[in-house]
Curated annotation (Swiss-Prot):
Signal peptide limits: none
Keywords for the protein's UniProt record, in alphabetical order: Ribonucleoprotein, Ribosomal protein, RNA-binding, rRNA-binding, tRNA-binding
Protein name in UniProt: Small ribosomal subunit protein uS7
HAMAP family assigned: Ribosomal_uS7_B (MF_00480_B)
Gene that encodes it: rpsG
Family indicated by similarity: Belongs to the universal ribosomal protein uS7 family.
Amino acid sequence: MPRRRVVATREILPDPKFGSQTVAKFINHVMSHGKKSTAERIVYGALETVSQKRNIEDPVSFFEEVLENVRPMVEVKARRVGGATYQVPMEVRPSRRTALAMRWLAEAAAKRSEKSMALRLAGELNDAADGKGNAMKKRDEVHRMADANKAFSHYRF
């Protein structure tokens, strides 16, 4: 962490198809090895597949809804107190909530067994909308950890 100055947050331009900053951020999360056009094709293909499957006119609002389902409210952070390390539950700030949700969705989709990444992502988005899937499992696991360590909440930073 820099001691001198706070680094300015980069402005993310909205994506070309939907004009949404959220979708643009998610494309960046899906992107690997700098292949943005491939990531765009994957995300747009997944949103197209989901909107056809569920008869949705606005895939962006559906995506926002899915993100809201996956966003964690609390997480645990390690804190050393007198030689012991405690897992202290803390509230997650809004920007990190979104980033974690996007990361979990992308990782969960990559681990699925469908043929193409677009189909995997579509399946994961579908499952997350229904409250299932690995991304939701990850969120529930984080919430469970925070709940189990509620006794240490007075050690907050």
